[in-house]
Structure formats: C-alpha cells, structure tokens
Amino acid sequence: MREYDYLIVGSGLFGAVFAHEASKKGKKCLVIEKRDHTGGNIYCEEINGITVHKYGAHIFHTNSRRVWNYVNDLCEFNRYTNSPIANYHGELYNMPFNMNTFNKLWGVVTPAEAQRKIAEQRTAVSGEPSNLEEQAIRLVGTDLYEKLVKGYTEKQWGRDCKDLPAFIIKRLPVRFTYDNNYFNDPFQGIPEGGYNRITDELLDGAEVRLRVDFNVTPENRAY
C-alpha cells in the first residue's frame, strides 16, 4: 500500500494549489522541493523589515473573479497597480506606451495625432525587417525605439539590437488611451506580507521535503 496518494514535484504556486486541493479531498500528498525553501519563484525574503521578492517582482493579476476570491481567501491582497516609469537620461515616461507617453514625447493630445506620428516614423524601415532594431521601428517608430526599446533590450540580451533576430519582438503593446495600468486584468495586487503567506497556507495539509531533487528513472516512473 502506498504511503502517499500524490507525489508533487515542486512547491511553487501550481504544486502548492494542487496539494491544497488534494488535501481538502482527503488525499495524502508529499511535496518535494529541490531548493531550500517553498514557494518556487514567488518566494519572498524579509530584508531589514522589507518584504523582497527574491525572484521577482511578481504582481498577481487575473481577469477571473473566482481566482481572485480564491487567493483572497488565503491572504489579504493590497490594491497595488503596476504602472512602471521608464527613465531615459532623466526623462520619465509611462509604460507601457500610452497617450501619457506620447504626450510627454511629442506633445500630442489625441490618439489620431499619436497614430500619425508613429505611422510617419515607421517608414524609416522599408521591406521585411532583418533584425530586431528594424522590427521595433516598424512596430512603433524611431523615437520610441531609441528612447524606450533599444537600451532596455540590449541590456537584457547583452547584444546590439542590430545583431538580434527580428522574431524576438513579435509585437509591442501600444495603447491610445490615458491609462498607465500595465495589465488589462480587472483584479491585481500583491499579498500583504508577501507570497510566503499564501504558499504556507496552501501547503499546510501536505508533507514537504526541501533540498530533494527528482529525476524520472525506470525505477521510479511507476510511482
């Protein structure tokens, strides 16, 4: 007779939710985690009294009221709204690209004005884009590329945009509204006190073993 009903590899959000739901149905779960902590990439650390997302940042967002109610039953969420600001040599721009960005960049106030400006600048590249730089310009024009795409992308990839393939950027989000909210989902926030409160609650009914890796072999495949 097996000691456990389920062996769950990984204690991140997926594994923790599965363990929680299975435990509620009377199933015995063993969760193994190769790291020295639970929570996967949403794990948080307390540093000088500040909750830090070790692998983050992670902003929870969903368009499902059912999912939102589920996580709020586990832990209270704050009302944080993700509205990033990009700093280009002391010039501050709202992200993702929206009418506040375009107003700061060009002084335009209507969507039609912004669309015309982008359309004019997109013509700087003709034909099929051969690299990421050309692809980005074809999508959003030269000004947005030079100030808000080029530096970030080159830092991310460690290479010049001209040396990166065009397919890396399929699309760039552009909004012609005065909305600085990064996400379109109606529900978003960060759990008060960090994500550890959620994963601790989810894993409460399961046995958890840390620093245990798992490799599928012929011997354990039929577990």
Segments the model singles out, each with a brief description of its role:
Residues 2-4, 217-223:
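Core beta-strand elements of the Rossmann-like FAD/NAD(P) dinucleotide-binding domain
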Residues 4-31:
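N-terminal Rossmann-like FAD-binding beta1-loop-alpha1 element of flavoenzymes
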Residues 18-19, 41-42, 219-220:
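Short glycine-/acidic-enriched loop or helix-start segments at secondary-structure transitions
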Residues 19, 68, 199-203:
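Short amphipathic alpha-helical segments and helix-helix/interface helices
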Residues 23-48:
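Glycine-rich FAD pyrophosphate-binding loop
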Residues 28, 51, 76, 207-209:
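Conserved beta-strand segments of alpha/beta enzyme cores
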Residues 48-123:
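Dinucleotide-binding Rossmann-like beta1-alpha1 core, especially the glycine-rich loop
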Residues 89-93, 100-220:
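Active-site/ligand-binding neighborhood in enzyme catalytic cores
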